[in-house]
């Protein structure tokens, strides 16, 4: 998870540090949309951990699937933009890297959540025996 965040931050920092052009307006809007949805998802994940209540993990899984579909649609949209309009290769690279690492971040977080749920179930079962 930390590595995913590092890659996103480092790529964005290098883009700005090298004085590359800003992202296109639609790219910024798309990333804000993803960031908002991701923030809501992480709030749910945080609450699960806070309460140690993994009963709603199926709902969280559906939300995760929705987030992954959203980022994949945005990747497809960017590919279409590259085919039909003139785009800066550096902007496209940054945009792709942010979305792809976001997918990895979502997957890494969910793996951790699932492992924690399994551990809690094992612990409960072990106490009953």
Language model regions located:
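Cytosolic, long alpha-helical scaffolding segments
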Residues: 1-129
């Amino acid at each position: 998870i930390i590595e995913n965040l590092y890659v996103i931050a480092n790529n964005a920092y290098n883009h700005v540090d090298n004085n590359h052009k800003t992202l296109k307006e639609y790219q910024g809007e798309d990333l804000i949309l993803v960031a908002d949805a991701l923030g809501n998802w992480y709030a749910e994940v945080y609450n699960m951990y806070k309460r140690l209540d993994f009963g709603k993990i199926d709902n969280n899984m559906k939300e995760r699937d929705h987030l992954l579909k959203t980022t994949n649609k945005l990747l497809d949209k960017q590919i279409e933009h590259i085919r039909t309009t003139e785009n800066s290769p550096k902007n496209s690279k940054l945009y792709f890297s942010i979305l792809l690492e976001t997918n990895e971040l979502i997957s890494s977080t969910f793996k951790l959540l699932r492992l924690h749920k399994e551990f809690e179930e094992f612990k409960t079962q072990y106490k009953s025996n």
